[in-house]
């Protein structure tokens, strides 16, 4: 559960990074610096509509518009994770000294460029403490990893089920 929680924290940080910078971050240390020192705008959005005279149709018509106003800024770490969050712990795979692997890019899906990212933790690293006890299981998944996001598909979901962790 610790690994998947950290993957989800990185996903939330990536989404905040993209909202502020327009693209996902490809360097995990840059993402940590953003969480540590970055700020997120607090935006108030109001949908409004008004009537106007349309010369083509020669009648009153309704026009919808959106008004946005920046109310202030808040530190990324506080906004996403609350006070007392340790940004440096976010990048380490629990129980090891290894770091998560992170990449970002763009793909073209249906003639639209879509920003993508992928964060992964190899099974061999995550389960290093029990790997010797179950060698047959690890031979089957030697090159696989717990992953969130994808560099080939426009998704930010993970390749794992987190139902056990959510029920606690």
Predicted regions and their residues:
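N-terminal Sec/ER secretory leader and immediately downstream segment
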Residues: 1, 12-14, 39, 45
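N-terminal alpha-helical signal peptides/signal-anchor transmembrane segments
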Residues: 3-21
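Low-complexity, acidic interaction segments enriched in glycine
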Residues: 19, 23-168
């Amino acid at each position: 559960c610790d690994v998947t929680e950290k993957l989800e924290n990185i996903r939330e940080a990536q989404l905040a990074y993209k909202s502020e910078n327009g693209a996902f971050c490809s360097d995990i240390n840059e993402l940590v610096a953003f969480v540590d020192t970055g700020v997120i705008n607090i935006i108030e959005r109001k949908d409004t509509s008004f009537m106007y005279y349309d010369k083509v149709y020669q009648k009153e018509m309704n026009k919808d518009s959106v008004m946005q106003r920046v109310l202030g800024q808040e530190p990324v770490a506080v906004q996403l994770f609350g006070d007392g969050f340790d940004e440096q712990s976010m990048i380490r795979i629990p129980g090891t000294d290894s770091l998560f692997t992170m990449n970002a890019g763009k793909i073209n899906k249906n003639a639209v460029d879509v920003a993508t990212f992928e964060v992964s933790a190899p099974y061999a690293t995550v389960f290093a403490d029990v790997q010797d006890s179950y060698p047959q299981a690890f031979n089957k998944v030697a090159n696989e990893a717990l992953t969130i996001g994808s560099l080939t598909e426009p998704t930010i979901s993970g390749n794992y089920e987190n139902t056990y962790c959510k029920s606690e």
